[in-house]
Structure formats: C-alpha cells, structure tokens
Amino acid sequence: MILSDGLIKELISYRALVIEPLSETQIQPSSVDLTLGSTFLAIDNINVPFLDPKRKETIKYREIHIEKGGQLILQPGFFLLGTTTERLMLPNFLVARVEGRSSLGRMGILIHATAGYVDPGFCGQITLEISNVNNIPVALYPGMRICQVSFELLFENCVIPYGLKGKYQGQEGPEGTRIFLDFLKE
C-alpha cells in the first residue's frame, strides 16, 4: 500500500518517519518532493582506462560544490552523483521509492540510474545518480525540487533492517560506490 499525504503527515508528526528539513508544501498527494543539495561527485577518469568494481583504487571522484544562488550546468551525456538536501529516517515497516520529477524528465534529466529503492531502517541523505540524456546542457540549482519519494507499507516489520548491514547507512552528501565491499564478502 502506498501512503497518502494524510498518512505521511501522521507518521511525520509521531516521528515514526523523519524527513528533515521539510516544508509542508513539499508533501504531495502520495509522495514528498525532495530538493537538490549543493555538493556533487564526478567520476575522475584521468589515468584510469576503465572502472573495476573489484578495485576501489580505480574509482575516484572529484567533489564539486555549488554556492547558494549558483547553478550547475550539466552537459549532455554527463553523469554525476548528487544528494538530497533532506535527510530521511525510515522505520522498519516502510520502504521508500525515489523517482524523478516529470518536469525534469521532459528536459532530459534522470535522477537515478538504478538506485530508486530505499530499504526499511535506512537513515541518511539520498544519493542521486544524475545524468543528462538531452543533446543540450541543462542548468540545475541547489535547493530546487529534484525528485519525489513515495512510501510503501510492509505487511510486517522487517527482521533485518538496513541499518544492521547497509553499507550506505548514515550517508551525508553524495556517496560514491562501495561495490568493492561486495567482493570482500565472497
């Protein structure tokens, strides 16, 4: 069951669901609009012939910070990691789904390549996988509404919430891949 605005507001009022900072105007009929943070990570591909998920040293990022009132011009075909301004704390009985906004999609901006699913128990800012599939540059502004998150109720609390084993738990700002940790478990 996807939560309605009334249920979202009720869970927030009891602090069972935390979204901070949050304005009442961000709450939509069945989702919450999230805004774009001011820090981004771009893959640094200098002297790296390819990215290898097994080798952490092949995956390096350079940080980009946009000052308040500034803009980021995202070039065609370019990919970077961004973050939401808001920090979420999900209870063990909710799953969140992050989706792009239609208005930005119509300009060629995608906000996630694959990671639109947020597990119960997650706490932190949402890292966005932003790309421009248009053939012209697009301006993005910190603080603008960049995506929306909806919430689905589980039939029962999960047994192992994300916080007990999640490699991105507590992330602040955009977080680069930690896929190399998967290979250490094998």
UniProtKB/Swiss-Prot annotation:
Leading EC class: hydrolase
S-S pairs: none
Swiss-Prot/TrEMBL keywords: Hydrolase, Nucleotide metabolism, Nucleotide-binding
GO molecular function, one term: dCTP deaminase activity
Catalytic activity: dCTP + 2 H2O = dUMP + NH4(+) + diphosphate
InterPro entries, per database record: dCTP_deaminase, dUTPase-like_sf, dUTPase_trimeric
Annotated site residues (Important for bifunctional activity) in this chain: G116, Y117
A family per Pfam: DCD
Active site per UniProt: E129
Pathway, per record: Pyrimidine metabolism; dUMP biosynthesis; dUMP from dCTP: step 1/1
Ligand binding (dCTP): R101, S102, S103, L104, G105, R106, D119, T127, L128, E129, Q148, Y162, Q171
Gene Ontology terms: biological process: dUMP biosynthetic process; dUTP biosynthetic process; nucleobase-containing small molecule interconversion
E.C. number: 3.5.4.30
Role of this protein: Bifunctional enzyme that catalyzes both the deamination of dCTP to dUTP and the hydrolysis of dUTP to dUMP without releasing the toxic dUTP intermediate.
Oligomer status and interactors: Homotrimer.
Annotated HAMAP family: dCTP_deaminase (MF_00146)
Family in the record: Belongs to the dCTP deaminase family.
NCBIfam families referenced in this protein's UniProt entry, alphabetically: dCTP_deam
Protein's recorded name: dCTP deaminase, dUMP-forming
